[in-house]
Amino acid sequence: MARTLSGIWLLLILVALTQAAPVARQAPAAQQFPPGYIDPRPILDAARKAIGTDALHCVTISGTAYDGAVGQQKEAGKNIDWPRIDSLANYTRTMNWDNWTMKEEFDRKPGLAPAMWKYGIGWIDGTGMQKNAHEIFMLNGKYGWYMNGANGKPTAVPPDIAEIWPVELVLNPHGFLKAAQLPGANPKAAWRWELGELGRDGPEVQPEITRIVSIMYGKYRIDATVNKENMLQRLHTWVPDPVLGDMNYEHEFTNQSYIDAGNGIKFPTVWHSHQGWDDNFNSQNISAGHNAFGGPIKDVKPNVCPDPVAVPDVVRNATFPVRVETTKLADGVYLLGGATHNSVAIEFSNYSAVFEAPLNEERSLAVIEEVRKLIPNKPIRFVINTNQHSDHAGGLRTYVHIGATIITHFKNFEYYNHDFINYTPRTLKPDMVSLWPPTELAEGYYWETVRENYVLTDGTRNLNIYYVNPLQKVEGMLMAYLPKEKLLLEADLVDTNEPLPTTLSRDQQNFLKAVQLLKLDPARVVPVHGKPIPWPDFAKIAANKSN
């Protein structure tokens, strides 16, 4: 009986203990990642702590920078970078990550670049030249605008350019770490061993582990490499470009460039930006353009951001309709204007040709529809490309889609055929060639290259095409001449959207000399930028002292 009672008491004690003390829960299993992938959270947390991101809400930085003009190279080649237009003196940038706004301002010599262009991508001729030394560029959400001069009129930039500007808020160490905390960022991480850069970092001895964290920022996937000191070094994404498609866009920083800005905040003071691949050993591109922006920007003011960057109504309400305004130049010859760049349609007996396919696919589609109305039931058989600057060539792929043959200078062919007119997928802004590639692109009749001259004819009408050289602005320039109509078609040599010069530049002198040597007799010059003018209005300037 005693044993029975003692057993009962033991059972009661065990039940009471069970009810009084909850059973210890097992620790959840660590999150599993596929082979090659690692947890991004500890990497991001350590990086934020290392450079004091949580203490930084905004920053104003100042210094001197350079501007590389994407797509404005004289000639596309393995060792030819984007041209640097001028230094950006008194460069100042304010980035506010509480409001996701940005303001940039600097001084640059007037008359060298379009007023709407700051650096890198976005150069569009015909939009108006910079006339005041001081330039201001602002970004708030989807709105981007500029002011030429401190009291200049706020002017919106086209949406396809404004949508790229926000990546600058993220392609820096603090901006990336803040963007990684936004809804939808969905961070992912991987690792790799890295050696130093060939020819820069000395003998390659021992690779080091580098972590790569990738986030989404709107439609852009942005990557950051994080070294063993938890410092962000390379921030990289792709942006859409009418010529190069998904174009590499990155900023690079070194550990040595970070300074202590106070309150635990570290911020880089040397900027180095690439737009386009800088690694010609591996990218296999023909174009080597890459350096777009950079320089010593050593004055760092954390949490100083006085300008609210409010969007002006004139910017908020700005529209950018794609319109084509047609002017008949002669029977079967039409100027297709209404934009920064013109095209010219020429009718032949059983086909038509278009002189210049500028800007982008939207522009080309509008022009093509207008040509079909003006010259019905005749295919657009040829499109003549004046030069390989991106704003003049950006619409060519659309003509490939409809089956036209491109006529360009032979020096452009390798660049176009490899980097530009290809089947490479365009994921950020697909165009018609990337969506519906013609099955015989590699074998089809898509190219005619010109060395000195070329003639399109139907036996009645001739369109003579000539190589214009030498030029400082660009290599491989073509012009066209209709002898019966005495119309001279050209790009970038006589721009009537701006007042004519009082003296001729060297390129204009050589253009005039080419017309004289070829014994052409134009009555009017028809520019890609601006309205046609009588040829004597241009030629008479030669009597003045030239530059």
Give the ranges of each region predicted by the language model.
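N-terminal mature ectodomain segment of secretory-pathway/periplasmic proteins
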Residues: 35-42, 46-152, 187-191, 195-202
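Zn-dependent metallo-beta-lactamase
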Residues: 283-349
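Short, hydrophobic/aromatic-rich segments at coil-to-beta transitions
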Residues: 55-62, 99-103, 205-214, 231-235, ...
